[in-house]
Amino acid sequence: MGYVAKIVYDKDNRVTEENDAHGKIKEMRNRKRRIVAATEENKEEILKLYKIQLGREFCPWDDSYPGMKEIEFDLGRESLFVMIDGQEINADAGSKEDRIIAAISIDDDPQVERLDCWSHKLAPGAELSRLAVHPDFQNQKIARQMLVFGMEELARRGYKSVHFLVNKLNVKALRSYAVFGFDTVGECSLFGQPFLCYEKGL
């Protein structure tokens, strides 16, 4: 049986130690991550996070989308959320540097909402979209954490289901999302890419 990594959190949800694949302890005492609603002050940093995704495999985004228009649209509906990584620069002085490392939105895209594959029995439903994770923080299951948060927020707002699109060729993403038990309810071609339509009751 292979070694299972273990992460330990303190009472403030701060990672205090992590076992690597060799069983060694990695000290991470000065790091804290949290998911919060984005603010006007976050706009430029979120835009940079979006732009750094351009050119990555299976990314359908371009220079114009998503842009400041989408960020302001999401902020205006209180539907944009970010994960902040806070790491102390000087433990003695207590100074910190916060960095946005992921984002997700509750979208309202007419093209997606018009698809006839969404279940009427699970209405009202909403789309989670514009999920982005900084390349420096890939392979840490952050995308899953953002989806869990997004689904919890949708449930809090009274939605009965969540739906979103995943590139059907993106095997890594498909494997990552498989743990949630989404139903594949259809396929579509949008933004020049083939997508699977995922849906799940909340």
Per-range role (PLM):
Residues 38, 131-133, 166:
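Hydrophobic adenine-recognition pocket in adenosine-nucleotide-binding enzymes
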Residues 164-174, 190-194:
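Conserved beta-strand-loop-alpha-helix junction that forms the acyl-donor binding cleft
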